[in-house]
Amino acid sequence: MYVYIKQPGIVCLLCWLCLSCTLQRTEHPALRQAGYLMEEHADSAFSLLKSISSLIGMTPEDKADYALLLAEAADKNGYSLLPCDSLLNLALHVYHEEAKEHAIALLYKGKVQQEMENYADALKSYRMALEILSAYPCEFYWKGFVYNMLGGLYGKQNLYAQAKDMYVKACYNDSLARHNRHFISSLSNLG
């Protein structure tokens, strides 16, 4: 007994669903390794990322991931983020405007702008990052990070009441994230 499907559109839809469920994004192996190393061995992650000789052949998503990882590793090692500026611009174009990664790219872009003493743009980047992160209720680590940066930015402009408010919010989020290093930093900035 043969069953005929009268609508070829249904067949196409079923094929598309099957294929889309099986397709997975492949990540560059060095990026995966750098991600694993980042928290405990940021210096090794930075060296690994700097050893990637060319981004040619990487997908735009991998290039954007590379930008965020390199910025994070440079920041954790105390290096300037200025060399990451154009890569962060790429990441901002690749990630969806409501994605957590877009917010993280805005955070690091704000740090670049602050390093260049472009405080108005840095403030805008930080606020946009917080707006995006508000849709992610459990991202306490990144929220605390942004609030800490805002506190520093307000402090540089002698806006001490606003700086204090930001540091209090940073301490709150850092305590929820259970990230002692950030919590201690935010707490010392508050006092």
Question: Where is each model-derived feature located?
Answer:
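Bacterial N-terminal signal peptides that target proteins for export
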Residues: 1-10
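Bacterial N-terminal signal peptides
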Residues: 9-18
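A "functional boundary" signal
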Residues: 21-191
